[in-house]
Amino acid sequence: MMTLSLKTADFSCKTNESGQSGDLRWELVTSEERISLRLHSEKETELRSVVLKFNFPFERHDMLYLNGYQSWTDSRERGVKGRMHSLDRVPKRIVEKFSLDRYGDNRFVLYGRKGQMHGFSYGYVRRSEAYTLFGSLAEESGFTVLRFDTGENTVTLEKDCMGHHFTGDYTVFDLVILHGAEDEVFDEYFRLLGVAPAKGKRLTGYTSWYNLYENISEESIAADLKGFAGSKTLPDVFQIDDGYENAVGDWLVMNERFPHGMKDAADQIREAGMMPGIWLAPFAAEKKSILVKEHPDWLLRNENGEPQPGGCNWSGFYGLDIYNPEVRAYLKEVFDTVVRDWGYKLLKLDFLYAACLIPRRDKTRAEVMYDGMRLLRELAGDALILGCGVPLAPAFGVVDYCRIGCDMTLNWLGDAYMRPLHREVPSTRNTLLNTVYRRHLDGRAWRNDPDVFLLRDDNMKMSEKQRETLAAVDALFGGVLFTSDNVGAYDAEKRAVYERIEKLDRSCVTKIKSTPSKLTIFYREGRKKSKLTVSTR
């Protein structure tokens, strides 16, 4: 049984077939393998909601995966009694004060009870080794929110299209339902999407973030580079993270800790034998930035004309209006300078969801994000893009590498005060789980970036076993293998672990066992059989 619920500004209906009301026509086509819904209106029509529900027989031991909204959103297999927590455990005044509902989907998706879970763009039901994949082929017209209700035995599709105005044709849903083994269903899904396999090599590298965080300087970068001197094998990339700029948004104004500028830093990295990489958040502007002070008209604004906050990082930040010609001209100047003048060849582009914090009258949230990703690809030219903090589907086939989990933390579970917050909060355990459960994206959509591993003893709260578990998982499933350690300071024992980790890759994995309470990974290191076990509760 299938039910379509369609609501516009002046019409609503529930039906299970195609139909027409005045100037609005809808065409619903269903089969066992594909479901599509297309609208046509002769006059401008405002959509309020489009929901399509059909039956699915969940079984007691099924494992369910629903892709989270963006890079950082926790995305793991759950049992049929699983639940996703929203911000309902956090006082509203705290949510509003720190803009905690901006990182994920809390402002535009309702969360359900136990056994009611949702995701974006695609998801699957795994029954032992047999997969049933539900995948949207029509994401640019609006994000498809996919819901599993295991108590009701239903699958629901919802279009993120509230307030969208259209005239003419509008494809709401185009869903494929694929059955088979893991590789079978995902190979076919990405073939249908028209996304060519990602052939980029696995990158090894160093990033400055998880040691000094924003407190980097020319001196600290030089010291980190010196740490690699004399290494048997240099990493591919040395990436300078946040902390060099005056403020987020002021990309061409360096702070006092970088008096010689970023071209000088890139030259030093090249001279050391590595590819220069740099961090940018191109669609974000910090409240205290020169950009916000001098160009308030560049900011995204809500229906009340107020700047749209994107979160509480730094001094708080706003999203930029990517359709403003002056914003686009500024971003072109930034990318031309960073790539062509300074010489950075890998761009870590972060907080990208800031572009689509609010939809436009004539563009859904997804359309805005797709436009934003095309803009970045054009601006970057032949520089490598490592996407981060981005809704995933718009980045498929656009970025070369992409973060597929939240930030790791110096302890295992993340800070206790942050755990009840949104699903994007930093946590080593959560990002490790995302690395495993989003493994199907690696080599298909891009090469996966699982975030860094750390083996060091100083400035560290994880046990040695936890550190080595993270490093092994990153190597087994990642297309990026970065650290923030001073590798030159490793003793012989840590150097041996580092060299052993570098030899691991996906071909070493022999089996993955996932239950509602734990994840077990079986793999080989040469002739040695090994396994890793991680709690998923």
Language model features with spans:
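Aromatic-lined carbohydrate-binding/catalytic grooves of carbohydrate-active enzymes
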Residues: 202-206, 210-336, 340-361
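N-terminal carbohydrate-binding accessory modules
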Residues: 180-197
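N-terminal accessory beta-strand-rich subdomains and adjacent acidic, glycine-rich linkers
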Residues: 1-185
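Glycan-recognition surfaces
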Residues: 292-329, 333, 374-489
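Alpha-helix-loop-beta-strand connector modules within alpha/beta enzyme cores
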Residues: 262-269, 365-383
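Flexible loop/turn segments at secondary-structure boundaries
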Residues: 212-216, 245-249, 283-288, 354-358, ...
